[in-house]
Amino acid sequence: MKRIIYTLLLLYIVLFNTSAQKSVGEWSTYLAYYTTTKIAEANNHVYAVADGSLYSYNKEDNSITHYSKQTGLSDSDINFIIFNPEVNTLLITYSNGNIDLLSDSGIYNLSYLLDNSNITDKTINNIYLNKELAYLSTNFGIIVLNMAKKEIKDTYKLNKKVYSVVIDTDHIYAATAAGLIFASLDSNLLDYNEWKNYTLSSSEFGTESIRQIGLFKNNLCFLADPSDKSKTGIYYQESNGTVKNLLKNRDLKQMVIQNNKLITYTYSELYIYSSFTDRDVVNAVVINDIASLKDPNTFWIASGTSGIKGIRKNNNQYEIILENTNDNTKYPKRNYNYFMTMHENKLLVAGGGRGTDRWGRAGTLMEYEDGKWYNFNENEVNNKFRRVRDYTGIAVDPKDPEHYFISSYGEGIVEIKNNEVVQLYDHTNSALTPITYIPGLNPLDYVRIGGVTFDKEGNLWATNCEVTDALKVLKTDGTWASFGFNKFTNAHKVDKITITSNNRKWINADEGILIFDDKGTIDDKSDDESH
């Protein structure tokens, strides 16, 4: 609760000081739109998901629109979007199973899966559209959503993980973890016994390795990912039952069938099939998802940190029609805000964290000042030293506002000056200590720092978790000192430090609150007091 109140207070302060257009008490939402991973083309817009947040690109005026709970969405952390031209509606699903339908008439929420206590695993693996119906592949079966009526039509509880679904004239097919199954559309699909195994005559892969199934040129197509990665690829079944390979590539990520095209891709290469014998290959730098709904020669790509990229085929050449929609000064890099602090009207955010163990989050440092974000590139630390993750705190040098120390729950303390990496402190070059040695663990990954702060003299104080001496200090002369307390010996969650005007250090942990007073003599421990 204290962290929530502290976070809200900091947000209010920064928004009050930097958002001149906002009236007092009016909130703004700052969501990350840094890495675009999902895309869906609609009539006049291209919708995309970046870091779990929805935005759109207007194809007519090139404007960007962002969507959030403030604009009517029911939830956050989006995992799928797909546009259904039959009903002119965007289907949005969230990682917790919640569902929104976005159309010109507004946003309609369907919380069937979210609220269903009988379904514990609410993972949605894929979505297939057939007229006004959307078939949601889940870890327990298939949910059929009528997008025109805005209601759940059916739930097929197959008691197995379903990766993908497709429908032809007479049958519905499902790629599951147990293999490929199918049923007649005229049968009672609610009855598990109506679903039968579908056999493929292929020595290349087993049907349990099919991750996506589709229909192209009236042929069943499969993205198979068998244990033998040399056979990963796109396959299709001819009318006589023969299974043929279309493309083998161990790096294939997805198969998309839209606009009478079969499209598959690796991280940086597109394969666009107009038929089983007519293929274009396009290099596109970064590809996370692709959509093509309106013009069969125009393709929209979810291109990571470049946002939305558009390409068009013209005279047998592919040209870029949209290079980049990202403006990284407008958004935080990630939706992580484990620790925040204000310094001279600048908001500093450490996007890491910890629980019973480390969270494994990339070292995320973000700044917000004068209406703009600066997102520090964690690779500058990773490349100069090693990978540093799980930032837990930030301390700003009182004598230099561009000089920071960032604590990490695993790698020690990172020193940054003028947005450049200066040093990484761990047990090899400081008094910081790794946790008690456990065979097989690299001590460089277990220098666990809970928080950092400066005192008024310019000494940097840090809490060191799961060690004998839980409190460390980097003095102004560049040397270190350590302090141990019986209550905090090997304490798991020694956390933040607050230094009061009388120079006492207040430190919180699961074991309680420690108050430490060094009497202003760091090197003389004879007069120290703690309780």
Region annotations inferred by a language model:
Residues 20-531:
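Carboxylate-rich, polar loop motifs that coordinate divalent cations or form catalytic acidic clusters
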